[in-house]
Amino acid sequence: MTTTEEALTFESTSKFAQVRPHLKLHYHEAGVGNDTTIVLLHGGGPGASSWSNFARNIPVLAEKFHVLAVDQPGYGLSDKPTEHPQYFVHSASALKDLLDTLGVGGRVHLLGNSLGGGAAVRFALDYPDRAGRLVLMGPGGLSVNLFAPDPTEGVKNLGKFGYQPTRENLEAFLRIMVFDQKLITDELIDERFAAASTPESLAAAKAMGKSFSSADFELGMLWRDAYKLRQRVLLIWGREDRVNPLDGALVALKMIPRAQLHVFGGCGHWAQLEKFDEFNRLATDFLLDGGK
């Protein structure tokens, strides 16, 4: 662990912002002196949060960027409303309000994993003048399974936890997330289960899932509008991703005008953790590249 990692803790970076009368968001902030802001958006698995997804990435990115790692609505220490529009719209608009509340103007880069990748794309589509470059890891809503069965193994296990929220079902879900099974420790399982099994978290997760079949569900089908993205987009996929399999990248790669794709072998759905050093270099180089 580096000196920087030791200095940046959950407590030292933890902040709250009241972005609407009935919505308070929790986020982690680091690299405050840097000019360029990057927003990190976590995935949607049970017990997920910005810290659980990005704790080790935050110090590295904070060396170059002003980092805002946001607990999306319904997750972490953020409020957990159960009445909201399609979830990507819900999260993207909440992020816009957070940036306004914090006085962060101009464009921000967005780095999103899974559900967070979908929210990042929705933000870029709905607020194009506020979005810089996008780094998307196995993004939800953008991937279309051309060959893999649907629902995928990961989505099936996510639903199983929703119906029967036990520690055993959570462990089964988490093990699908990664290629390297050593990453799924008892400590991680216990931590995620404690966060996921509260009544508020379970209700929020149910509302999030329901929003993908509500009247405005088509707003979650991001691949339909992918051609509208004018930002540079880096798609990152794990070859062994069992949540949003690799073949799901092909439609996005074809439709997004300025997209590029990087595939990690020996990697599941959590590229930012399984390929930590390579991921950080790849994302940083992409975001700092001076090309248009």
Swiss-Prot record:
One of its GO terms (cellular component) is membrane. The active site is at H269 (proton acceptor). InterPro entries: AB_hydrolase_1 (IPR000073), AB_hydrolase_fold (IPR029058), AB_hydrolase_sf (IPR050266), Epox_hydrolase-like (IPR000639), HsaD (IPR054676). One of its GO terms (biological process) is steroid biosynthetic process. Catalyzes the hydrolysis of a carbon-carbon bond in 4,5: 9,10-diseco-3-hydroxy-5,9,17-trioxoandrosta-1(10),2-diene-4-oate (4,9-DSHA) to yield 9,17-dioxo-1,2,3,4,10,19-hexanorandrostan-5-oate (DOHNAA) and 2-hydroxy-hexa-2,4-dienoate (HHD). Also involved in biphenyl and polychlorinated biphenyls (PCBs) degradation. Keywords: Aromatic hydrocarbons catabolism, Hydrolase, Lipid degradation, Lipid metabolism. It comes from Rhodococcus jostii (strain RHA1). Its EC number is 3.7.1.17. Homodimer. The gene is hsaD. Belongs to the AB hydrolase superfamily. HsaD family. Substrate binds at G44, G45, N53, N113, R192, W270. Pfam families: Abhydrolase_1. This is 4,5:9,10-diseco-3-hydroxy-5,9,17-trioxoandrosta-1(10),2-diene-4-oate hydrolase. The lineage of its organism: Bacteria, Bacillati, Actinomycetota, Actinomycetes, Mycobacteriales. Pathway: Lipid metabolism; steroid biosynthesis. The record marks S114 as: Transition state stabilizer. Disulfide bonds: none annotated. GO terms for molecular function: 4,5-9,10-diseco-3-hydroxy-5,9,17-trioxoandrosta-1(10),2-diene-4-oate hydrolase activity. It catalyses: (1E,2Z)-3-hydroxy-5,9,17-trioxo-4,5:9,10-disecoandrosta-1(10),2-dien-4-oate + H2O = 3-[(3aS,4S,7aS)-7a-methyl-1,5-dioxo-octahydro-1H-inden-4-yl]propanoate + (2Z,4Z)-2-hydroxyhexa-2,4-dienoate + H(+).
